[in-house]
Amino acid sequence: MEDRRESELKVFCSKNILSILGFSCIIAVIALLALGLTQNKALPENVKFGIVLDAGSSHTSLYIYRWPAEKENDTGVVTQIEESNVKGPGISGFAKKVNEINVYLTACMERAQKVIPSIQHMETPVYLGATAGMRLLRMENKQMADKILAAVASSISEYPFDFQGARIISGQEEGAYGWITVNYLLGKFTQKLSWFNLKPSKDDTQETYGALDLGGASTQITFVPQNETTESPNNNLYFRLYGKNYSVYTHSFLCYGKDQALLQKLALGLQGTNGIIHEPCFHSRYMRKIKMSVLNEGFCTKRHELNSSFYPLVDIEIRGAGNFQRCRQSIIQLFNTSYCPYSSCSFNGVFLPPLHGQFGAFSAFYYVMEFLNLTSEESVSVEQLTEKLEEFCAQRWEEVQKNFGEVKEKYLSEYCFSGTYILVLLLNGYHFTAESWKNIHFMNKVRSTDVGWTLGYMLNLTNKIPAEEPMSPPLPHSTYVFLMVLFSLILLAVIIVGIVVFHKPSYFWKDMV
């Protein structure tokens, strides 16, 4: 009878203890799982967006950038996520049709609305920077330039973004922002590139690259000189990026973009003719007519005073001659290298410190070299470019059309000039030598991001955009660790008690009565 009572007591106690231990075990496991899942839950991506429109002399492009709301040393880690080219000319081409600007920008702005989450439209800044085409128009007709910018501002303001204004950026800004872009994409500014998922550089002291930009109406050169100079303070700019200060030399040559340089050359070539230009920079058997007004009314061609006998002419006829050497010599005449009021100059009396370091050449520098099939190698020699141009310029127009029929006639007809112009600009204008030419790297995209001034502009502006606190887990790390240890110990204690209890001898249960 007594054995039966002991057995019943043991069963009764076992059930109660089992219930308590089981309940405690479940609570501890649930607590551990809840803590782990909550604390380690993937945090929502906390990013910001920005839009920059590059209103160039020949076209307009829209770029969308994004960066983490929490910034690195006060500068955002920015990456390009979208590029949209606007159909049509640059905005300076709307001087006689300002009312069409609204339609002109519609497609790209609607695209931006789709790419950026609607919840962030109101906080996304939009900037439009107009470059050399509008700088020229402002010099020729300031009232018209202001009217175009007002129309652009009115059009962009209709969209649900934070429009920050449309303005004409200076040549210095264009050059400096291009320099920022090149060095940012090459990892020269910061070691912490984890947001980009890139391998950080081990060399924190590596030198920055210089930047060479060639557009339709201007060209820019920007680099950090080996020795800081005060000869021409107007050419010095200072930046603070990623917690470090930079002093750069920069200069923009208005009228020396490839399109305006060609007009200068044609105006110069018109001298001493009867209105027919035999142009060595165009292929033989090629013919083109241009309006006389383009040459005698343009800001860039005014310095080449045309004889009054040309004024009655409505059209100028251009006949290609296809001679690289003559083309090269005629382009050299555009650069005045005989006058220099400083210790060293580029051309037209503009100060240029000795060239230093590697250079990234982009925009038209790259596009022309790509057409000539000279961008596949790490570096291209002067001899390679010269040989290619001699061969290409000597081809008859029909042959060129046959070989490159998919290229628009305007661009195709000018590649001989553009390639030769690049050669002369770099050698005679910026004074690269056959040896230092090897330091020039022609680039278009780096890590899927376009090389140009817009990214540098966005990076510089993020210095002015307040940073946000990083997204953090619900619990402080110390609290999380304490609770995990506590519930783990509780679970361990429950298991140990369970093992001890169920292995006690029978007299243990008697003692409990």
Curated annotation (Swiss-Prot):
GO CC entries: caveola; plasma membrane
Positions glycosylated per UniProt: N73, N227, N245, N307, N336, N373, N460
Known EC number: 3.6.1.5
PROSITE patterns: GDA1_CD39_NTPASE (PS01238)
GO terms classed as biological process: nucleoside diphosphate catabolic process; platelet aggregation
Extracellular side: 38-481
Sequence ranges on the Cytoplasmic membrane side: 1-16, 503-513
Active site: E174 (proton acceptor)
Main subcellular location: membrane
Record PTM text: N-glycosylated.
A single MF term (Gene Ontology): CTPase activity
Catalysis: reaction(s): a ribonucleoside 5'-triphosphate + 2 H2O = a ribonucleoside 5'-phosphate + 2 phosphate + 2 H(+); a ribonucleoside 5'-triphosphate + H2O = a ribonucleoside 5'-diphosphate + phosphate + H(+); a ribonucleoside 5'-diphosphate + H2O = a ribonucleoside 5'-phosphate + phosphate + H(+); ATP + 2 H2O = AMP + 2 phosphate + 2 H(+)
UniProt topology in membrane: Multi-pass membrane protein
Cofactor: Ca(2+); Mg(2+)
Disulfides per UniProt: C255-C300, C281-C327, C340-C345, C393-C416
InterPro entries xrefs: GDA1_CD39_NTPase (IPR000407)
Family: Belongs to the GDA1/CD39 NTPase family.
Function according to Swiss-Prot or TrEMBL: Catalyzes the hydrolysis of both di- and triphosphate nucleotides (NDPs and NTPs) and hydrolyze NTPs to nucleotide monophosphates (NMPs) in two distinct successive phosphate-releasing steps, with NDPs as intermediates and participates in the regulation of extracellular levels of nucleotides. By hydrolyzing proinflammatory ATP and platelet-activating ADP to AMP, it blocks platelet aggregation and supports blood flow.
UniProt name for this protein: Ectonucleoside triphosphate diphosphohydrolase 1
Gene source species: Bos taurus
Originating gene: ENTPD1
